[in-house]
Amino acid sequence: MRLHRLRARLSAVACGLLLLLVRGQGQDSASPIRTTHTGQVLGSLVHVKGANAGVQTFLGIPFAKPPLGPLRFAPPEPPESWSGVRDGTTHPAMCLQDLTAVESEFLSQFNMTFPSDSMSEDCLYLSIYTPAHSHEGSNLPVMVWIHGGALVFGMASLYDGSMLAALENVVVVIIQYRLGVLGFFSTGDKHATGNWGYLDQVAALRWVQQNIAHFGGNPDRVTIFGESAGGTSVSSLVVSPISQGLFHGAIMESGVALLPGLIASSADVISTVVANLSACDQVDSEALVGCLRGKSKEEILAINKPFKMIPGVVDGVFLPRHPQELLASADFQPVPSIVGVNNNEFGWLIPKVMRIYDTQKEMDREASQAALQKMLTLLMLPPTFGDLLREEYIGDNGDPQTLQAQFQEMMADSMFVIPALQVAHFQCSRAPVYFYEFQHQPSWLKNIRPPHMKADHGDELPFVFRSFFGGNYIKFTEEEEQLSRKMMKYWANFARNGNPNGEGLPHWPLFDQEEQYLQLNLQPAVGRALKAHRLQFWKKALPQKIQELEEPEERHTEL
């Protein structure tokens, strides 16, 4: 009897020690373990420069089944369970994509290459960065990052959430989603409705709702944020009926759901292009999908190569109607949002990566016309649209430097500034909206880019994450360091409270009837009515001129 009691006591002690060990690993251990609904994950403890707290990282956690075989061009399915402890110490494979243009036109300027991750169709993973002290019950705000890349490239390993997590005491989640043809091909019918990449994002957010408490996060305080096509994704999630309730705030950096070239009402154009590129010349959409499912990784990469960007579609599921209609609908219920742009969005990165024009050469009228034609094709806009834009932005000007600045403003307004302002106007009467214009050119880029540059597309990212391309440390000036800390606090305060303002920060007013916005520069200031005269052109003059041009054509057709 005594022996039985002794064994029971020893067993209880052993269980207690094991429980303490697991709890220790879950918090301060160099080899932390956390539990998800599909199994345990081993992470790493990272010591963050400039922060008192360490951060635990859990990389490459599956949030869906690998989208292979019959799951290619199909909605994501829940992940399968695993036994034992899964290794979460290395980045996941990136989704299939063509990296040639980005590496040759952009990263080469910094003598850098992409992180040496493998590339695979099996890529539906997310990574988590959580303060080392966090535990289930910490209820920390959660910030889910959606990367940009024109919906054709990008990866989780390009971003490091450690600094944001450590300095602002938040849980950062970075997700991957299918890209290019695998992510957004559609036949426009039941055989391939499309928007697979967007559905992946929804699946990742559902996973966060189920599991983030195990990593110290609060599932009732989730903010989604993204840049460029990531901002478009965030904005699209805000209007989509199937993602409601999965997040509670949204930050759209240089990209919204109305960005031309990233949304199409019809799948016809992309479907036809893909059919031609793939040599799947079947007229029947079911046969076309079957043919594409049989293509190898190398063949899919070859089909992807010509796409510099690819649009989502009105699929009846994720987007039951065009985002503009959803934004204007009476039943639209947005979440509090930060919406913003940079003041030189088309200055350097996009023209280089998309090879629109030579950024090192002076631009004459002929070069501007050729560049405009390339952009109209990419953005799927009619030639008459381009003529009206040239008339408004460029006129008869022939001075090369002025011409280039006018062309850059025209394209930045078309793609980013005007759509962002339109979304802000749609949302601000129904939920709080905070608008910003980022204006600072990073000091470390001044020797690489033309001297007239301001804040280019993506320039705000190192200030939000306090790192550059996969965690590379940046040498900020002291003033830039202060700007970065302000921006991190604004973003994290918004994730905590739905309001970016806080102690020690310059006041950021709501975007409302007065159209006030924050100018994010070394000395932040409040501005008012950004691009007011251009917005009037886009809202009133341009639609009226297009209608006037279309009316004679309609009369001619009737005759």
Swiss-Prot record:
Species whose genome carries this gene: Homo sapiens
Quaternary structure and interacting proteins, as annotated: Monomer.
Family recorded in the similarity comment: Belongs to the type-B carboxylesterase/lipase family.
UniProt subcellular location: Endoplasmic reticulum lumen
Catalytic activity: cocaine + H2O = ecgonine methyl ester + benzoate + H(+); a carboxylic ester + H2O = an alcohol + a carboxylate + H(+); 4-methylumbelliferyl acetate + H2O = 4-methylumbelliferone + acetate + H(+); 2-(5Z,8Z,11Z,14Z-eicosatetraenoyl)-glycerol + H2O = glycerol + (5Z,8Z,11Z,14Z)-eicosatetraenoate + H(+)
MF terms (GO), sorted A to Z: carboxylesterase activity; carboxylic ester hydrolase activity; methylumbelliferyl-acetate deacetylase activity
Name of the protein this chain belongs to: Cocaine esterase
Active-site residues, as the UniProt record annotates them: 228 (acyl-ester intermediate), 345 (charge relay system), 457 (charge relay system)
Disulfide bond entries: 95-123, 280-291
Keywords, sorted A to Z: Disulfide bond, Endoplasmic reticulum, Glycoprotein, Hydrolase, Lipid metabolism, Pyrrolidone carboxylic acid, Serine esterase, Signal
BP terms from Gene Ontology: catabolic process; prostaglandin metabolic process; xenobiotic metabolic process
One Pfam family named in its UniProt record: COesterase
Principal place of residence: endoplasmic reticulum
Enzyme class, UniProt record, top EC level: hydrolase
Keyword set includes Calcium: no
Enzyme Commission number(s): 3.1.1.84, 3.1.1.1, 3.1.1.56
Processing after translation: Glycosylated.
CDD domains, A to Z: Esterase_lipase
Tissue specificity: Preferentially expressed in intestine with moderate expression in liver. Within the intestine, highest expression is found in small intestine with lower expression in colon and rectum.
Motif position, Prevents secretion from ER: 556-559
Signal peptide: 1-26
